[in-house]
Swiss-Prot record:
GO terms for molecular function: translation release factor activity, codon specific. One of its GO terms (cellular component) is cytoplasm. Transmembrane segments: none annotated. SMART domains: PCRF (SM00937). The gene is prfA. The keyword Protein biosynthesis applies. Pfam families: PCRF, RF-1. The keyword Cytoplasm applies. This is Peptide chain release factor 1. It comes from Cytophaga hutchinsonii (strain ATCC 33406 / DSM 1761 / CIP 103989 / NBRC 15051 / NCIMB 9469 / D465). It is found in: Cytoplasm.
Length: 359
């Protein structure tokens, strides 16, 4: 492990020197990439410095024990060694987590898709509630959310809403949100006071660059139509809305949020690229046999992942059995607890897999 940490320290020193190079500073894309790598490596280098300090102190305490005759000094050295041994174990666990290979998509921006599922109007209303939950979380994280397309429900909320979210490590934070979110509550339209169960599906797709997915424009059919508002009424007399169909996969994407046809086309193409990437990525994982039976799920949008119980003010994530008894706070965007617990569960799984591979 020390050899690996030394190699990381050497790379960190190289990057630290490179970002001060005027030639690199003039290349903003290269500079941003190196700056990001610097921040990632710095986390490991700082912990490694603490680890080396603990190892040095352990050696010093052992040396005291080997030469010291005074019983009091020997006792102090023994106590120090016991404390340092615990610190060493703790920091080694932190280092192992930091050395887990990151999902290459973690740093990417995302396309967030939310759709009302079973439950009719109530499902659309809940889809709107889920959207606002993520909206508030984005506000707190300082991320930018941009609407791509939305179809409003007849009684509020959304039958479907698609947006882009950009910021630091967006996919890494929100990738576990993909799946079916179930709600149990008394709908506003319910006169008997009965609790109904509805659902909304969430898909979190990494936003990919043009280099990541090469799309043949001959495989894409482009249709234009007038933007429409609630109830299908026309809100734009120009054909600015765009519908793209990827003929080989049958994937259809539309965007009508912008007044400009060009901007709608660019947004729709961005979503299409991410969806094609998801299809190809899952196919690749299947071929390599890496789709493991994970405790935290496969990220499939059909997995039932979480239940929001309004009468009991309870939110339960079924993948890890984690429950929060403060539903209003969760719906206000306080989902950090779930995100952190899911991240820890993923790290524990990957550490276990790493141990099995090296056994």
């Amino acid at each position: 492990m020390v050899d690996k940490l030394e190699a990381i320290k050497s790379r960190f020193d190289e990057v630290a020197e490179a970002i001060l190079d005027p030639n690199i500073m003039s290349d903003m894309k290269r500079y941003a990439s190196l700056n990001k790598e610097y921040k990632e490596l710095n986390k490991i280098v700082e912990v490694y410095a603490q680890y080396k300090n603990i190892l040095d102190n352990i050696e010093s305490s052992k040396k005291v024990l080997s030469v010291e005759k005074d019983p009091d000094f020997r006792e102090m050295a023994k106590e120090e060694l016991e404390t340092l041994a615990v610190q060493k174990d703790d920091i080694e666990l932190v280092i192992k987590e930091l050395l887990i290979p990151k999902d290459p998509n973690d740093s990417k921006n995302i396309i967030l898709e939310i759709r009302g599922g079973t439950g009719g109007d109530e499902a659309s209303i809940f889809a709107g509630d889920i959207f606002r939950m993520y909206q508030r979380y984005c506000d707190r994280m300082g991320w930018k959310m941009e609407l791509i397309d939305a179809t409003e429900g007849t009684s509020g909320g959304y039958k479907e809403i698609i947006c882009g979210i950009s910021g630091e490590d967006v996919y890494g934070k929100l990738k576990f949100e993909s799946g079916v979110h179930r709600v149990q509550r008394v709908p506003a339209t319910e006169t008997q006071g009965r609790i109904h169960t509805s659902a909304a599906s969430v898909a979190v797709l990494p936003e990919v660059e043009e280099l990541d997915v090469q799309l043949n424009m001959n495989d894409i059919r482009k249709d234009t139509f007038c933007s429409s508002g609630p109830g299908g009424q026309s809100v734009n007399t120009t054909y600015s809305a765009i519908r793209l169909t990827h003929i080989p996969s049958g994937t259809v994407v539309q965007c009508q949020d912008e007044k400009s046809q060009i901007k709608n086309f660019e947004k729709a193409l961005k979503v299409l690229r991410s969806r094609i990437y998801e299809i190809e990525y899952k196919k690749q994982q299947d071929e390599l046999g890496k789709e493991r039976n994970s405790m935290i799920g496969s990220g499939d949008r059909s997995d039932k992942i979480r239940t929001y119980n309004y009468p009991q003010s309870r939110v339960t994530d079924h993948r890890i059995g984690h429950t929060v008894h403060n539903l209003p706070a969760v719906m206000d965007g306080n989902i950090d607890d779930f995100i952190e617990e899911l991240r820890l569960a993923e790290n524990a799984e990957r550490l276990k897999e790493g141990a099995q591979e090296t056994a």
